[in-house]
Structures are given as C-alpha cells and as structure tokens.
UniProtKB/Swiss-Prot annotation:
Catalytic activity: 1-(5-phospho-beta-D-ribosyl)-ATP + H2O = 1-(5-phospho-beta-D-ribosyl)-5'-AMP + diphosphate + H(+); 1-(5-phospho-beta-D-ribosyl)-5'-AMP + H2O = 1-(5-phospho-beta-D-ribosyl)-5-[(5-phospho-beta-D-ribosylamino)methylideneamino]imidazole-4-carboxamide
PANTHER family recorded: HISTIDINE BIOSYNTHESIS BIFUNCTIONAL PROTEIN, HISTIDINE BIOSYNTHESIS BIFUNCTIONAL PROTEIN HISIE
Annotated protein name in UniProt: Histidine biosynthesis bifunctional protein HisIE
One GO-annotated biological process of the protein: L-histidine biosynthetic process
Superkingdom of the source species: Bacteria
Entries under InterPro entries matching the protein: His_synth_HisIE (IPR023019), HisE (IPR008179), PRib-ATP_PPHydrolase-like (IPR021130), PRib_AMP_CycHydrolase_dom (IPR002496), PRib_AMP_CycHydrolase_sf (IPR038019)
CC per GO annotation: cytoplasm
Residue ranges of coiled coil: none
Region (Phosphoribosyl-ATP pyrophosphohydrolase): 116-207
Principal subcellular localisation of the protein: cytoplasm
Amino acid sequence: MLSKKENLLKLDWIKTNGLIPAIIQDFASNLVLMHGYMNKEAFLKTQKEGFVTFYSRTKKRLWTKGEESGNLLKVIDIVTDCDYDTILIIVEPLGKTCHLNRKSCFFLKENTLNFLSKLEDLIEDRKNFNTDNSYTARLYKSGTKRIAQKVGEEAIETILAAMKNDGDELINESSDLIYHLIVLLHDQNLNFNLIIENLKKRKTEKL
C-alpha cells in the first residue's frame, strides 16, 4: 500500500509539534479532496487499517473520515514531501468527501476530469430516480441486456460517423457512446475511475 517507506520513517514530528498536515488526493482524477492533520497515532492507524484517520484539533481525538457517513477514504498510497513535514495521501473516495455533499472540500475550477466525475455521480444517483423523469433511470430499469445493446448501437453509430468523415456527428455519437458505457459500468457496480487506473497500469511505450 505504501511507497517510499524509508521516507515515511523520516517524518519530522518534532518540527510540526506532533501534527503533520495531510493532503488528500483522488487517485484517478488527481482532484485534491481535502486537508487535515495527523498525529503519530492517527498516521499509524491510517497505515494499519487502510482508511484515512485524522486527529481533530477541536475535539482532541482521532476521527476516521466517513466513520459516520460511510464516505470513507481508502488509502492507495502515501508519500512525503522533501522536508518530511507534510504528507500526500492518494485515495479512492468511497462517496462524497465534503460534508456539503460535494466531491471536494475545495472550490476548484472545473476541469475535464472533474466534469467526468460529476457526470458519474449524476448517473449513479439516477439508479433511484423516478423512471418517469429520467432516461437514465429507465435505462437502469430496462436491465443489463438492454443497456449493453445500447452501447453496441452507439458504437456502430460512432463508426458510421467516422466513415462519413463527419466531425460534428462523430463528437455527438462518441458522447452518446461514452454516456451509455458509463451507465453500463455503474449497472455492474463499476466506474470509469477503474478504467482510467487500468490504462495507467499499461505500458505506454507499447501504445
């Protein structure tokens, strides 16, 4: 789970008065999710259990992010900065990180990956929507076979648009294809982050 273990052993707890700042970042989108503080006990608990635990300076106790809401932060990796007084924790967020029901506690300008993440959240939320008001909800209700069929149909339409050298139509059909693919992934309890992570693991020199 951890990288650069030798560097983590060098964390300067004395310099930081026993509290190390911890920056939390989404492993797939690189979105900065939140910031907190850890004492040595919180840090060791995070390492041992694999979920982010902070030290609350106001309540004077440890608290695991998401211990009440269920929106835990699953640890993927932990690295330290060059001064050994700050750590960066790469996580897989299991739900919304911010208490305002947002992906991030920071008000960041939307970029492409942030938009994709928001789109996924919307598509996932539609599982429980009234089918009268949502095309996505109706898709979910129609079942996996129908959703997979729609992905196939949109793939064919994307190919046909490319064969016609129609750029605008290709963009539109590609958008439909990606949308339906995301619905299919969520129907199978998967998400696009897993696709991104899988692509990261592939040897780019062979692409």
